[in-house]
Amino acid sequence: MRRKKGPASSSDHEEPPESDSVIPETPETKRPSGSSLSTAISDSDSDSDSEISGSSMMPVRKLRPRKRKAASSADEYSVSDEEEEIVVKTKRRPTHSRTTRSTSQQAQPAHQKASETVTDIAHPSPLKTSGMAAADSVQQRRRQQMCGSSQESDSRKGGRVSAADDSEEEGQRSKDQERMLRKLQRKFPHLNKNELRDVLQEHDWLIDDALETLRMFSDLVVESEDDSSQTSTPAKHTRRVAETRPQAQVTKLSSPPKPKPSRPLDGTRTSQRIAKQPILAKYTYVSSEEECSDSEASVVNGLLDSDSDQSEETLSKLKTEILCFFQSASVDELTLIAGCSLKKAQKITELRPFKTWKDLDDAMRRRNGLSAELLAGCREVLKEREVVKGLMSKCEEISVKLIQDVTQVMDKGPGSMTQPEILSSTFQLKPYQLIGLNWLVLLHQNKLSGILADEMGLGKTIQAISFLAHLYQEGNHGPHLITVPASTLDNWVRELNLWCPSFKVLVYYGSADDRKYMRYEILNQIVEYNIIVSTYNLAIGNSSDRSLFCKLKLEYAVFDEGHLLKNMNSLRYRHLMAINAKYRLLLTGTPLQNNLLELMSLLNFIMPNMFSSSTSQIAKMFSMKSSEEQSSFERDRITHAKLIMKPFILRRVKSEVLKQLPAKEEQVEFCAMSERQQELYSALLHKLKHSSNGEKRELTNVMMQLRKMSNHPLLHRQFYTTEKLKAMSKLMLKEPSHRDADPALIKEDMEVLSDFELHRLCQQYSALHEYQLNTDVLLDSGKLSLLTQLLNSLKEKGDRVVLFSQFTMMLDILEVFLRHHKHRYNRLDGSTPMSDRIGLIDQFNTDQDIFVFLLSTRAGGLGINLTSANVVILHDIDCNPYNDKQAEGRCHRVGQTKTVKVIKLISKDSIEDTMLRIGERKLKLEQEMTATQDGEEDTLPDDMTTLLKASLGL
């Protein structure tokens, strides 16, 4: 009975620092004046403007921890990447030789150093070239680590830790890295997330070093903006550096030599970097409230303060836009400005109207909690809007091109759209599926990826297989990767073999040893294949799995149930993004689930080259919560989203393309809780509402406890009191397996179990048989009472039922209920072995005597065909209504011949009432996105916390 505690997670231990690490960089405040310029700008091997973009724009200085040594150690004097080779060679020399050389270098006149600078730029020494090459090789190795290539590190570890420990350690490390990344995002909101990640990686995820570099980078860009306004020759740049050098290096010969700065001060890299300052400047906007320097604020406010006394007609375009924004923006939009809290936003709305620029400027400087920095922050918001508008323009151009291509196809007549010849002649694509196939072909011809978002049951699997068959017929034999949920793996393999026998399909599935052998065969080209089929969990299961799909050169990566990629900040999203595929195709019946930002995450996944540079702007524009006060820009969000998604998403609903598909009827049954259940629910609600702050649990836990009680009382521990558990723990000593156990520990373990789990424990051990629950207690639930009448009525009509529940323990209780009423059933949940799932589905579809199919909503709601049933009962609804929609689609799909009835069981006057209302509001978002006519956007309060608190009275 007593559960043993497992070993401590390996994630609690960190890898020891590398022995050849570099001395930490000298803090800027302790450096001699004039040296910050040389340490602040990023290094680049090329002067080409085209190469300075994205992450290469950021400083790439690698700072690794080093143990501090005595001041006399020769190792402290040379730490730059270029001089690594010098450090290695001079470690064996006497200390005085290095001191003499260092002193002589410091004594050189400034003009001599300037001439050496020009010489080094034109003719870099072989030693420095090799150092730079070594630095490049280090950077290249680190880039490879992003693809999960950790086989070399695994071999060095030599089996000290198990694969499970590696996974736990990597998971903890990923969480720490995400935490550091979020911290940098808060401090530098104007920088791209991918750029911040690159900076952290280049500094070995040392956040202090990354922060210091980013601060210096931010200060330097402001200087570069000032410098770019003056026309200066390269010679002047060099002379300025040379003139500042004596201040940084003047040292008395009699005093001990000081350690060199962590970067070379010979002027070589400094001159190269200065030439690139204007390029860096154009990527920098206004800094956030936390990190905004005085120089940046003065630059922005200086621009805005000029001509502030003039009339509105003569204001610059920028001032006019800012004035309009502060005059018309909602509170939600005002909070998008860096440093503008909700309180400040409300204050701004109270001070309206702002008829002229002077009115706005005076309001910001009136010591009312506002500041002129908000005007500068407004520029950033306006620039973000411009980025989104530019993205929409690109998408609109693509749409026009695709429409022209579609028109040409339509002009050729319907006969031009035929299914590939290599598809099995036994099957025939439906007209709308042929349209989907041709849409995918057009995307491919334009070198675009896409999202096939047809409603559940319209045959997205078949359309994807047909498209891959078309590529095969055109000479593109792959390889392709199809990533699917575990519950649909067998179905995909079956459909591939049925529809296109020409494909050589490899199923990447099995234990760790099985997959290791398969990786060996794949990488050594021992096995032939066109398509690899795997699951989400195994495709990124461990570093070796991820490394395989980074090394393979895939043509297409197809992701079934693509809405699983809705969170661009998740670890799964990042790992799957690293798969080396030329194109990506997402299949999802529910592209819109909670908000527009999730849709943008899907678009960013399929077209990272187009969307990744605008990720932060898109996140701000589309993650804004709606409110009763809606501005014109906020009302246009759905219109903007439609324009952006139009070229990349094809969505058809059943009512449009399947006129012959039977109707779907939906009804909600409000079930009154049983007398005892109502008492327990009220007591639990009272306890949660009146608990002290120290005892009050998180809202999600409160919600879960109320959900369980509204479904069945036995999901809590109410019947088995503490006195009963004490008696039961003593009886357990009679069992041979627990004779030497401690009754107190047995009782402690029993206290965490629910009533139903304790009931099954009593069934398992003969000593506890007398404590089993009777049938009346097991079936004491309002929903089960209604279900008794409902199933009897459906059985008499000859209907067959698919019964869904969120909780596997509720499925256990439903099994007891079905056996009691003598109903035949099958059951499938997340614990069902993969090898058994397809057999259970086939058995239900062929054996008409099986009345009910029990399914868990998450495991059984994806990609399963159960058209032999015509009634769907949702015993308990999901917080996400689209998961319930997926479950409904198991029956209402191609092949259904009867009217499908969907019945939702809702416990009356419970938490489920609120969940139902939230779900209905979320579904309105999809209706707006798929509407053919524009209309006003309804209020979509997606703040579940507020609604739940209101319903609970908390």
Curated annotation (Swiss-Prot):
InterPro entries from the UniProt entry: CUE, Helicase_ATP-bd, Helicase_C-like, P-loop_NTPase, SNF2-like_sf, SNF2/RAD54-like_C, SNF2_N, UBA-like_sf
Domain of life: Eukaryota
PROSITE patterns in alphabetical order: CUE, HELICASE_ATP_BIND_1, HELICASE_CTER
Chain segments carrying region Disordered: 1-195, 223-273
All copies of domain Helicase C-terminal, residue ranges: 786-948
Chain intervals with Low complexity compositional bias: 33-43
Entry-linked Pfam families: Helicase_C, SNF2-rel_dom
GO CC terms: chromatin; nucleus; site of double-strand break
Main subcellular location of this protein, as a coarse class: nucleus
Chain intervals with Basic and acidic residues compositional bias: 170-181
All copies of domain CUE, residue ranges: 176-219
Segments of skewed composition (Basic residues): 61-70, 89-99
EC number(s) on file: 3.6.4.12
Occurrences of domain Helicase ATP-binding (ranges): 441-609
Keywords of the record: ATP-binding, Chromatin regulator, Chromosome, DNA damage, DNA repair, DNA-binding, Helicase, Hydrolase, Nucleotide-binding, Nucleus
Cellular location(s): Nucleus; Chromosome
Catalyses which reaction(s): ATP + H2O = ADP + phosphate + H(+)
Annotated ATP binding sites: 454-461
Gene3D superfamilies the UniProt entry points to: P-loop containing nucleotide triphosphate hydrolases, Tandem AAA-ATPase domain
Family membership noted in the UniProt record: Belongs to the SNF2/RAD54 helicase family.
Name this polypeptide is given: SWI/SNF-related matrix-associated actin-dependent regulator of chromatin subfamily A containing DEAD/H box 1B
